[in-house]
Swiss-Prot record:
Subcellular location: Cytoplasm
Keyword Aminoacyl-tRNA synthetase listed: yes
Primary location: cytoplasm
Similarity comment text for this entry: Belongs to the class-II aminoacyl-tRNA synthetase family. ProS type 1 subfamily.
GO molecular function, one term: catalytic activity, acting on a protein
Subunit structure: Homodimer.
Annotated domain remarks: Consists of three domains: the N-terminal catalytic domain, the editing domain and the C-terminal anticodon-binding domain.
Keywords of this entry: Aminoacyl-tRNA synthetase, ATP-binding, Cytoplasm, Ligase, Nucleotide-binding, Protein biosynthesis
Name of the protein this chain belongs to: Proline--tRNA ligase
Protein encoded by which gene: proS
One cellular component (GO) term of this entry: cytosol
Cysteine pairs bridged by disulfides in the record: none
EC annotation from Swiss-Prot or TrEMBL: 6.1.1.15
């Protein structure tokens, strides 16, 4: 492909609204342009890479037994009402009405649509199991689109849905998808980890997120180097081992005047104590119930664990009016002592049991209580794992030490069970003629997000460094001076020879200075650059440069095709077949 004929509008300056490397480079390398906040046009180079990612996804999905279809993006609200998600999903769901005033949504996901389809078309165990997938544009009205293709309002996603007659069948499909995802993200060149996760708004039990590791990731991953444990912060279990009780009982509690001191940091400074001696008390509204949650002052409440403990739909901090009605005091001076259990549940994180001489709010403005002990001074209805894991905690699997990393979610696999099939009446007749709900799994990949994650992990100060498997082209052929006939002819011959060998070539035939073309080549980041100078005619050699490490090789023209194939195979780390015959 001649570069002069392609739309590749490279930029020298970094766009002011681009925050991260992948966003900057997608814009500077002429691969994407923003139409509106969180909405992008994919230009020819980016689209070539997207198509390659999609081809890898299709190959692995088909190998795992998936069947591709394509569902509508526009979904009737009626389906979402059947599952109850129309009211639960929130403002991220793009809602609209047609000319007949009928409500619809632009799909962020397709559980309702696929369940409706399978419900209407499959009614016997003989037609199960089945795994159906699509690659399609999705919509989500993000409150704050950011980081380019990492968090968009319109994005490309692969979503798959399996339907089984048994839990064992679901487990097999789930493992097949897990293995397929591992192959996909390995082949596209990502450094990733599969981490235990919470199912969130999708619902279901048993889920893993596939995280591309990078510093700009919005998610924190807890992992241990001693084994294969990895989980996101929402899911990571905290190991609790009771500490030894002190030999002496804490003194009787005292009321202390603490004017204007509301935060943990302020209490630590004012009382000259450690944060772990404070019992932090927060009041939540869990669905229609008020709950006081206690956690040690140096820990943070995990709202996902709280939601799961109550099997709740909605969890959020209580209003100031609710807090005052329960405690008589504003937030910052709230505590468990003297609280009426008829008005509010009192639950606590496991580690609150280790606070034997603690500080809590006195339920009175500008006052706290000291020398407080759980069990003696207040009663907890239930202890549970309710806090975020922290670095240095014990790994729940291996006993090793927990460390943190940042990651971008590029894939997610769920065991949905019968959540959607029961709600929507997706049943089949078993061997005995009895009606049973189908058992479902759900499996998503952010295709457009993956391209951003690949760039985020593969770049330097000069531009993108594409992995061979998803590069827009394999080789960039650049004549130093395209006006020199010998250089042009040699470049055209090289391009054609490589093309016939199944190697994809971008031929920079523009009448630009060599320095400009080299800068653009580094910015675009194709795996190999072949520089054609006068030496091509005089000595029969060209320079081959590896983008990944900057190595250069002088290669004879009659050996060039084989040498390029060999270098590309060595540079590629996925072990995939790269070229045709």
């Amino acid at each position: 492909m001649k570069q002069s004929q392609m739309l590749i509008p490279t930029l020298r300056e970094v766009p002011s609204d681009a925050e991260i490397a992948s966003h900057k480079l997608l814009l500077r390398a002429g691969m994407a342009r923003q139409l509106a906040s969180g909405i992008y046009t994919y230009l020819p180079l980016a689209l070539r890479s997207l198509h390659k990612i999609q081809a890898i996804v299709r190959e692995e999905m088909n190998n795992a037994g998936g069947q591709e279809l394509l569902m509508p993006a526009m979904q009737p609200a009626e389906l979402w009402h059947q599952t109850g998600r129309w009211d639960v999903y929130g403002p991220e769901l793009v809602r609209l009405r047609d000319r007949h005033d009928r409500p619809f949504a632009l799909g962020p996901t397709h559980e309702e649509v696929i369940t409706s389809l399978v419900r209407d078309e499959i009614n016997s165990y003989k037609k199960l199991p089945i795994n159906l997938y699509q690659i399609q544009t999705k919509f989500r009205d993000e409150v704050r689109p950011r980081f380019g293709l990492i968090r968009c309002r319109e994005f490309i996603m692969k979503d798959a849905y399996s339907f089984d007659t048994s839990q064992d069948g679901l487990d097999r499909n789930f493992q097949a998808m897990y293995d397929a995802y591992t192959n996909i993200f390995t082949r596209v060149g990502l450094n990733f980890r599969a981490v235990e996760a919470d199912a969130g708004a999708i619902g279901g039990k048993g889920t893993y997120e596939f995280m591309a590791l990078c510093d700009i990731g919005e998610d924190t991953i807890a992992y241990s180097e001693e084994g294969d444990f990895a989980a996101n912060l929402e899911k990571a279990e905290v190991v609790y081992k009771p500490s030894a009780k002190p030999a002496t009982e804490a003194p009787a509690r005292e009321k202390l005047h603490t004017p204007g001191i509301k935060t943990i940091d302020q209490l630590v400074q004012a009382l000259q104590i450690e944060a772990k001696q404070i019992i932090k008390s927060l009041i939540y509204r869990v669905d229609d119930k008020l709950v006081m949650v206690l956690v040690r002052g140096d820990h943070e409440i995990n709202e996902v664990k709280l939601k799961n403990l109550y099997d709740a739909t909605i969890v959020g901090l209580a209003s100031e009016a609710d807090i005052v009605s329960v405690t008589g005091a504003p937030a910052g001076f709230v505590g468990p002592v003297g609280i009426d259990p008829e008005k509010v549940d009192i639950i606590a994180d496991n580690f609150v049991q280790d606070v034997y001489d603690g500080v809590v709010g006195a339920n009175e403005t500008d006052y706290h209580l000291t020398h407080v002990v759980a069990g003696r001074d207040f009663t907890v209805s239930k202890y549970a794992d309710l806090r975020n894991i922290t670095e240095g905690d014990e790994c729940p699997r291996t006993g090793g030490v927990i460390k943190f990393a940042r990651g971008v979610e590029v894939g997610h696999v769920f065991k949905l069970g019968t959540k959607y099939s029961t709600a929507m009446g997706a049943t089949y007749l078993d061997e005995n003629g009895r009606s049973q709900p189908m058992i479902m799994g759900c499996y998503g990949i952010g295709v457009s997000r993956t391209i951003a994650a690949v760039i985020e992990q593969n770049n330097d100060e000069n531009g993108i460094i594409w992995p061979v498997s998803v590069a827009p082209f394999h080789v960039h052929v650049i004549p130093v001076n395209v006006k020199v006939e010998e250089q042009r002819q040699a470049s055209e011959q090289i391009t054609e020879a490589l093309r016939k060998a199944g190697i994809e070539v971008l031929f920079d035939d523009r009448p630009e200075r060599a320095g400009v073309k080299f800068k653009d080549a580094d910015l675009i980041g194709l795996p190999l650059r072949i520089t054609v100078s006068d030496k091509a005619a005089q000595e029969g050699t060209v320079e081959v440069r590896i983008r990944k490490n900057g190595e250069t090789h002088d290669v004879k023209l009659d050996q060039l095709v084989d040498e390029v194939k060999g270098i590309l195979s060595r540079v590629d780390q996925t072990g995939a077949a790269l070229f045709g015959n």
